[in-house]
Every structure is written in C-alpha cells, then in structure tokens.
Design a protein with these regions (language model features):
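A short, compositionally biased
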Residues: 149-152, 189-191
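Charged, gly/pro-rich active-site loop segments
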Residues: 44-144, 184-268
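Surface-exposed connector loops and short turns at secondary-structure junctions
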Residues: 22-26, 188-189
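A short, hydrophobic beta-strand micro-motif
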Residues: 28-33, 192-195
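Short beta-strand segments
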Residues: 1-17, 23, 33-37, 44, ...
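Generic recognition of flexible, low-complexity loop/linker segments
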Residues: 142-145, 155-157
C-alpha cells in the first residue's frame, strides 16, 4: 500500500505481531522509501524514480488508536476492505493483522531521476560499515525457480557513502554462485546489500516477494541468506489460503501478545 502523506510526513504501518520494521526504525531512525513500481499506485512507467531518505518516528503506545487509523485507511482505499471491515465479524477475524504500529518518516532528502538514466551522484556509491561482517555465500539453487516468476527488475537496497539507506531498481544476471548487477551504484568491497524481488498484480490481487541478503564484490552480488515472503508459485498473495491461514494464526495469538506487553484487549 502507498504510504499516506500527512503533516509533511510519510506514514507507513506494520503489524504489532510482526514488528521488525518498527524495531529496526527505532534502532536506527535513518530510513529510505523508493517509489518505482506503478502498479496500484496511480503512477505510470513514464514517471521518474523517486527515493526519499528520512528520519523515522515509531508510534506504538496506543495500539487501539493505531488500529482504528489503519482500518480507516483500508476502508478508504479498497471496496473489498470496506465490505469486510464494515462488519464487526470481519474486523475480529482479522484482528491479528489489523493491530498496528505506525512509522512516520520526516523526509530529509529527495532524489529524482528518469528511468534509464544515471543515478544521482549522492546515491551512486555503496559503503561498507566497519561493523559489517562478510559471511560465506550460499548456493542459489533454491532461488532459481523463484526468479523466473519476477519479470520486473529487482530493488537493490544498500547504504550510501554517508551511511544512509538507499534503494534503486537494477538489472541482474543470475549465475551459479553470484548475481551480476548493472545499472546500480559503485560498491565498496564487501558492502552489505539486499535484493528484493517483488510481484504485484492489480490492486493487490496478488502480492508476493522474497529477499536475498548478501554483499558486493565490484558489480557482483554474493548471496548470504534467502528470505521468502507471502506465497509460493501456486499459493501466493492476498486472498490466498496461505495468507488467510497466516492472518488466522496472528489473530489467535494476539490476546496473549497484548497481555504479555501489558496492553488492553482491542475493541473491534
């Protein structure tokens, strides 16, 4: 879902039951958002890429208010969600997914460039922090069947020369033990990076992705860890049985998690 733009901030949300984004933003508030995929966004293939780097603020004190805010956002964007969420039964069935943490990003820098043109110099270099430990690469055998499902160029996420997160679309060629990158930034030897392959159909009729974390050697990306998300070839995306089971499990575990955190039950 596209973030809301409120009070000169970008507003994102993540689940209370899967709070990794919020934890990461609290640990290091420097974040980035790349606007590059026109699907379900109102943008077109002719629009330029836009990268926003900013400082994140995490809102997780009032989960009731956060959840109501998220429900209002969903109902304003989707007729299907309006149908489901008008019913208390529908809201309670999705409670584990609807329980939200909000992350608001105060923009600090904006980079805009045309598709097919060179990257802006400010994000044209990948740095390696002193704390990053390069690990042994893993084989791509398991990923090869997945890669053919993703026709759109993947997103390469990295740290720029000042240590700020950045992300760009790149072209890739998959080899047996590495992935060749073209159209991306120059890389410091051993710079950490993450490739995200994303498949979105229509207005979230299907939403599937996986990530490959690794490091760079010149223009070669060496994978260290494969991370799947949201579906398989025959069971993917929103509306799938797999995602419905995921939401059902979140809802089942939500009361215990709220109690563990000392929070009151949600009123839906």
């Amino acid at each position: 879902m596209m973030p809301a733009y409120e009070r000169e901030r970008l507003a994102f949300s993540t689940g209370l039951m899967y709070p990794m984004k919020a934890r990461n933003a609290r640990r290091d508030p420097r974040v980035a958002a790349l606007f590059s995929d026109p699907t379900a966004s109102g943008r077109s293939q002719d629009d330029p890429f836009v990268l926003v780097q900013g400082l994140a603020e995490v809102f997780d004190h009032d989960i009731q208010r956060n959840t109501e805010r998220y429900i209002a956002q969903l109902m304003g964007k989707s007729s299907l969600m309006r149908f489901v969420l008008r019913s208390a039964v529908g809201r309670k069935a999705m409670a584990g997914y609807l329980a939200r943490i909000w992350i608001e990003v105060i923009p600090q820098r904006e980079h805009v460039w045309d598709r097919g043109s060179a990257l802006p110099p400010a994000i044209g270099f990948m740095s390696r922090p002193a704390s990053f430990v390069v690990r042994a690469p893993v084989a791509l055998d398991r990923a090869m069947p997945w890669l053919r499902r993703y026709p759109r160029p993947p997103v390469l996420a990295y740290l720029d020369e000042h240590g700020w997160p950045a992300a760009v679309r790149v072209h890739v060629a998959v080899r047996s033990d590495h992935i060749e990158i073209s159209g991306g930034p120059r890389a410091e030897d051993g710079a950490p990076a993450c490739l995200t392959y994303h498949r979105l159909i229509g207005n979230y009729r299907a939403n599937d992705a996986f990530l490959i974390r690794g490091h760079m050697r010149a223009d070669r990306f060496f994978p260290e860890k494969l991370v799947g998300y949201g579906g398989t070839r025959d069971d993917r995306g929103i509306g799938s049985l797999k995602l419905l089971a995921f939401i059902r499990d979140l809802t089942r575990r939500l009361p215990d998690e709220l109690a563990r955190q000392g929070r009151p039950p949600l009123k839906l």
